[in-house]
């Protein structure tokens, strides 16, 4: 029997749990939240769609009862607060680091062999924190960001090409941030044909720019962070692990010399399977892409340094 726990029953966490159930990724999905009744209510609401949508997954909600998460195969951490007006980067990291660290430690008490998928922001730094503080093998701690950014990239490519997003292949590497992500336009294809031969350089640059501000654009429209695509991206990563699909998915993972970088979690393509990260795939980047990746890594290192400043590591 397979089991997934999603911590945080807010918009992203609830969407992730809902997609996991609808796609019957696991036999049981547990949602845990600190707010009394929220996860229980959302779980009940979702279960009342089972007959309508035709899924058999059981969804359980609980308030801070980590015992109910016991023996989870994968745990997804969405907990944390958004950055508030006037809040410094260090303050946000300090608050969310405390939350993520506590959540991860409690989860592992009951599911010592679980694979951890991190969605909480700043995602690359929270993934690094979870890995470092728990002392787990690097294959078991994975940040979701690249899967989401790549999905947005494919959406904007499909809009420019006038095709279905499923007909496009595209990948985003680097940090999960609007100035650190690197949409790899050179490698994007439509039905096997390089997109660079189908779109003008100007149009392709527009697609890249739209991808990089994709999250910010949605925040401006919604008045809050997006949740459908982030939640679905988390579920997509979990599905590849639980079903041992061996998909190549860009995720934030610990590098130890790959791409010329070490001691940080950052987005690169990996093969996902039952062991979590089965393999890190090293792409042949050109000089411009290598320079952008190095700059992205430097920015992530700088953010990670704040973990020590606030005493989280």
Swiss-Prot record:
Catalytic activity: (S)-malate + NAD(+) = oxaloacetate + NADH + H(+)
Enzyme class: oxidoreductase
Alphabetically ordered keywords of this record: NAD, Oxidoreductase, Tricarboxylic acid cycle
GO biological process: lactate metabolic process; tricarboxylic acid cycle
CDD domains, per the entry: LDH-like_MDH (cd01339)
GO terms of molecular function: L-lactate dehydrogenase activity; L-malate dehydrogenase (NAD+) activity
SUPFAM superfamilies: LDH C-terminal domain-like, NAD(P)-binding Rossmann-fold domains
Amino acids binding substrate: 83, 89, 121, 152
Active site: 176
Key word Metal-binding present: no
Residues bound to NAD(+): 8-13, 33, 96, 119-121
InterPro entries the UniProt entry points to: L-lactate/malate_DH, Lactate/malate_DH_C, Lactate/malate_DH_N, Lactate_DH/Glyco_Ohase_4_C, Malate_DH_type3, NAD(P)-bd_dom_sf
EC number: 1.1.1.37
Function: Catalyzes the reversible oxidation of malate to oxaloacetate.
HAMAP family, per the entry: Malate_dehydrog_3
Family: Belongs to the LDH/MDH superfamily. MDH type 3 family.
Entry protein name: Malate dehydrogenase
């Amino acid at each position: 029997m397979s089991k997934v726990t999603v911590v945080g029953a807010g918009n992203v966490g609830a969407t992730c749990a809902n997609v996991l159930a609808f796609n019957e990724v696991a036999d049981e999905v547990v949602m845990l939240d600190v707010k009394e009744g929220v996860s229980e209510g959302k779980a009940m609401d979702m279960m009342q769609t089972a007959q309508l949508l035709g899924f058999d997954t059981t969804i359980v909600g609980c308030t801070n009862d980590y015992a109910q998460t016991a023996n989870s195969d994968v745990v997804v951490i969405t907990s944390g607060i958004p950055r508030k007006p006037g809040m410094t980067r260090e303050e946000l990291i300090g608050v969310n680091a405390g939350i993520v660290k506590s959540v991860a430690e409690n989860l592992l008490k009951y599911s010592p062999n679980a694979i951890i998928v991190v969605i909480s922001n700043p995602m690359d730094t929270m993934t690094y924190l979870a890995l470092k503080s728990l002392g787990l093998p690097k294959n078991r701690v994975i940040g979701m960001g690249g899967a989401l950014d790549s999905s947005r990239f494919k959406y904007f490519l499909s809009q420019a090409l006038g095709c279905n997003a499923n007909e496009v292949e595209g990948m985003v590497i680097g940090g999960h941030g609007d100035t650190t992500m690197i949409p790899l336009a050179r490698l994007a294809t439509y039905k096997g044909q390089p997109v660079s031969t189908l779109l003008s350089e100007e149009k392709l640059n527009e697609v890249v720019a739209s991808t990089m501000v994709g999250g910010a654009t949605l925040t401006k429209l919604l008045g809050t962070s997006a949740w459908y695509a982030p939640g679905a991206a988390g579920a997509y990563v979990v599905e590849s692990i639980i079903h041992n699909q061996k998909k190549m998915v860009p995720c934030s993972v610990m590098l130890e010399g790959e791409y010329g970088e070490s001691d940080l979690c950052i987005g690169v393509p990996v093969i996902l399977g039952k062991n979590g990260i089965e393999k890190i795939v090293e792409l042949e980047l050109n000089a411009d892409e290598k320079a952008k990746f190095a700059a992205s890594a430097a920015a992530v290192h700088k953010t990670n340094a704040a973990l020590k400043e606030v005493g989280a590591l």
